[in-house]
UniProtKB/Swiss-Prot annotation:
CTPSs have evolved a hybrid strategy for distinguishing between UTP and CTP. The overlapping regions of the product feedback inhibitory and substrate sites recognize a common feature in both compounds, the triphosphate moiety. To differentiate isosteric substrate and product pyrimidine rings, an additional pocket far from the expected kinase/ligase catalytic site, specifically recognizes the cytosine and ribose portions of the product inhibitor. It comes from Serratia proteamaculans (strain 568). Homotetramer. The gene is pyrG. ATP binds at residues 15-20, 72, 239-241. It comes from the Bacteria. Belongs to the CTP synthase family. This is CTP synthase.
Length: 545
């Protein structure tokens, strides 16, 4: 089987939406019956985004096989059925790390190690490895054409056309076509200059995706085609839309998938986008709305919680409810009190690291528990719920996590020192272990407790969910906590680690150590988020009565 490659680049400005555009195109090609995957090449020098600040970089998306990756991989999984893996994302730092390791080992036999050919060869090897077994691979190159950091990646994808054949490679370039109100027209010159920059590197784009706040007129698309040496039918207008789920249909309506299939000589049936049309219908025709408060520490950048926000919206789709998300800084709860939580239909505390704002989260969990407000805790959100319950119900004064207070009297949350990874191998960690690459991360099996709320929501006894954490419930203190009324609703496959807790005497209080947001999609939703949003709607109705 021959694999075809679509290389996606961006020009003029950053944040044009390359990831969404690539994922939307992949969704159409998948709907035509093709085996599709997507890769993201990141030009930064960090080995992976695992230790990068969420406020700078956004969330870290975790794959099934335990890779800590760019948030764009979350977009990919929400648009196509193919599961991403560590092969779908790599950085400049990872490439240089691999090449330097080989140099130290003597693999290059004393040769002078250079960007060309050694770095570019390493990039190409990873692209080819990631593309194995697929009909079409979309490769998104991070950054903007013209950035110094991107040059080795652009050179590598230029060489790919020579090595795998021009008939199996296609260059798709996203560019900005701004509208100038004073002139009353869109301007194509930035696009022309961006393509000129690509040409100077040796890449002639085959498709231009023109981003604008309005549809780019046919005469302007013809002008772009003429000056950029691209067929007119390959100049696609991608205007701003009120829902990102409309983008696959928008691209299909302009024949982009037909053009690509003809270019690659792929005999594929017409795309059926009925599932996406259903998503659009559900989003446009809600039966009501709920307000959910998300209490975290990175709220100044919503992308830090991208998958959680999307998963809440998916939960809304499954319940025909519009979900309004109110982002609340947990430090505001500490300074202003629980007044900032008034008027919410449900409360969610997502994952996080570090002590800042933790006490505000503990106060939030108590407020939700005592006022019968639906509560969903994720990762740290489960740990603070446990701390709160231990303090205020069990009577363990100042119960805490050893992450925050190493010598606390009641360490209800402690460092995991040993567990099994996704392959069944034993992993061991200590307080001295590096921060990068040392967490319990990736898909882990969980056995659900019979007659629990989560068992009812999932509809099956065993699930697999993705983790990213170092600390877990301390089993030494668990019996006392369970005796006070807390239910352990899910445990790890070896029965050693607590994965889910519930409060049976509360209308809807669920907290999990894993990250369910990473497996939620607009077409399928996720049982926990669907149940959580449903509970928010029911709470709202009770308040009205």
């Amino acid at each position: 089987m021959t694999t075809n490659y679509i290389f996606v680049t961006g020009g003029v400005v950053s944040s044009l939406g390359k990831g969404i555009a690539a994922a939307s195109l992949a969704a159409i090609l998948e709907a035509r019956g093709l085996n599709v995957t997507i890769m993201k090449l990141d030009p930064y020098i960090n080995v992976d985004p695992g230790t990068m600040s969420p406020i700078q970089h956004g969330e870290v998306f975790v794959t099934e096989d335990g890779a800590e990756t760019d948030l764009d991989l979350g977009h990919y999984e929400r648009y196509i059925r193919t599961k991403m893996s560590r092969r779908n994302n790599f950085t400049t730092g990872r490439i240089y790390s691999d090449v330097l390791r080989k140099e130290r080992r003597g693999d290059y036999l004393g040769a002078t190690v250079q960007v060309i050919p050694h770095i570019t060869n390493a990039i190409k090897e990873r692209i080819l490895e990631g593309g194995e077994g697929h009909d079409v691979v979309l490769v998104e190159v991070g950054g903007t054409v013209g950035d110094i950091e991107s040059l080795p990646f652009l050179e590598a994808i230029r060489q790919m056309a020579v090595e795998v054949g021009r008939e199996h490679t296609l260059y798709m370039h996203l560019t900005l076509v701004p509208y100038l109100a004073a002139a009353g027209e869109v301007k194509t010159k930035p696009t022309q200059h961006s393509v000129k920059e690509l040409l100077s590197i040796g890449i002639q784009p085959d498709v231009l995706i023109c981003r604008s706040d309005r549809a780019v007129p046919a005469n302007e698309r013809a002008k772009i085609a003429l000056f950029c040496n691209v067929p007119e039918k390959a100049v696609i207008s991608l205007k701003d839309v009120d829902s990102i789920y409309k983008i696959p249909g928008l691209l299909k309506s302009q024949g982009l998938d037909d053009y690509i299939c003809k270019r690659f000589s792929l005999n594929a049936p017409e795309a059926n986008l009925a599932e996406w049309e259903q998503v659009i219908y559900e989003e446009a025709n809600p039966g009501g709305e709920v307000t959910i408060g998300m209490v975290g520490k990175y709220v100044e950048l919503p992308d830090a919680y991208k998958s959680v926000i999307e998963a809440l919206k998916h939960g809304g789709l499954k319940n025909r409810l519009t979900v309004n998300i109110k982002l609340i800084d947990s430090q505001d709860v500490e300074t202003r009190g629980v007044e900032v939580l008034k008027g919410l239909d449900a409360i969610l505390i997502p994952g996080g690291f570090g002590y800042r704002g933790v006490e505000g989260k503990v106060m939030t969990a108590r407020y939700a528990r005592e006022n019968n407000i639906p509560y969903l805790g994720i990762c740290l959100g489960m740990q603070v719920a446990l701390m709160e319950f231990a303090r205020n119900v069990v009577g363990m004064e100042n119960a805490n996590s050893t992450e925050f207070v190493p010598d606390c009297k009641y360490p209800v949350v402690a460092l995991i020192t040993e567990w099994r990874d996704e392959d069944g191998n034993v992993e061991v960690r200590t307080e001295e272990s590096d921060l990068g690459g040392t967490m319990r991360v990736g898909g882990q099996q969980c056995h659900l407790t019979d007659n629990s709320l989560v068992r009812q929501m999932y509809g099956e006894p065993t699930i697999v969910e993705r983790h990213r954490h170092r600390y877990e419930v301390n089993n030494m203190l668990l019996k006392q906590i369970e005796a006070a009324g807390l239910l352990v609703a899910g445990r790890s496959a070896d029965n050693k680690l607590v994965e889910i807790i519930e409060l049976p005497n509360h209308p809807w209080f669920v907290a999990c150590q894993f990250h369910p947001e990473f497996t939620s999609t607009p077409r399928d939703g996720h049982p926990l988020f669907a149940g959580f949003v449903k509970a928010a709607g029911e709470y709202q109705k009770r308040q009205v009565k």
